[in-house]
Amino acid sequence: MATDIDLEGVAKAYGRWAPVYDLVFGKVFDHGRQSTIAIADGIGGRILDVGVGTGLSLSEYAPTTRLCGVDISEPMLRKAQSRVRTLGLKNVETLAVMDAKNLAFADCSFDAVVAQYVITAVPDPEATLDDFVRVLKPGGELILVNHIGAESGPRRAFELAFAPLARRLGWRPEFPWARLVGWAARHGGVALTERRPMPPMGHFSLIRYRKNRKL
């Protein structure tokens, strides 16, 4: 698949952001992060956090929720590892540098996969989503928080103006809802259970899919 995003470029971009990521983005993404954690904790069991970054969310999960975290950026992951050691987070099983499209986990390994602000920052979103579903147990949930492009109105104008900066940050600014609809239809093994806007301005959405119990 042709792509406008380069994986190495994304890793470098987030490596540059690592020292200040929590300060710059922590509050902006807080609502989506808290909503996602609440859902994942409600599911419980073993959770995969893709794009775990600096590990900002790790200490906010319930201590009974078992966590595995992966990220493409080594500098970001080093901060996450330091956070786990400092806070003594015993429920974090592993943190590893990993390509989200080629997860080094067996099929049906997790009760939920969490991916916040990830699918617009990977070269092949559909193949990446396929691998998320692969590692889910039957009946497991895929929980996404991501930018979904507006089709019209003031938010559309804002997104177009913001697009050059978004690309420099390693994000794909144009990502319509139709891409997720098309992916789910082609995959055939997931069902949409929720979609709701997140602050600020509804620019991000929380999206949930459930993996079919029988494929």
Q: What is the meaning of each model-derived region?
A:
Residues 25, 145-200, 205:
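C-terminal alpha-helical "lid/dimerization" subdomain adjacent to the S-adenosyl-L-methionine
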Residues 48, 53-102:
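Class I SAM-dependent methyltransferase SAM/SAH-binding core
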Residues 112-124:
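A short SAM/SAH-binding and catalytic strip from SAM-dependent methyltransferases
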Residues 126-138:
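A short glycine-rich, Lys/Arg-flanked "PGG" loop and its adjoining helix->strand segment in the class I
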Residues 46, 66, 139-141:
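Short glycine-centered segments of the SAM/dcSAM-binding site in methyltransferase folds
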Residues 27-44:
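Conserved alpha-helix/loop element of class I SAM-dependent methyltransferases that forms part
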Residues 1-16:
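N-terminal, positively charged/glycine-rich alpha-helical extensions of SAM-dependent methyltransferases
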Residues 101-112:
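A short acidic, Gly/Pro-enriched loop at the edge of an enzyme's catalytic core
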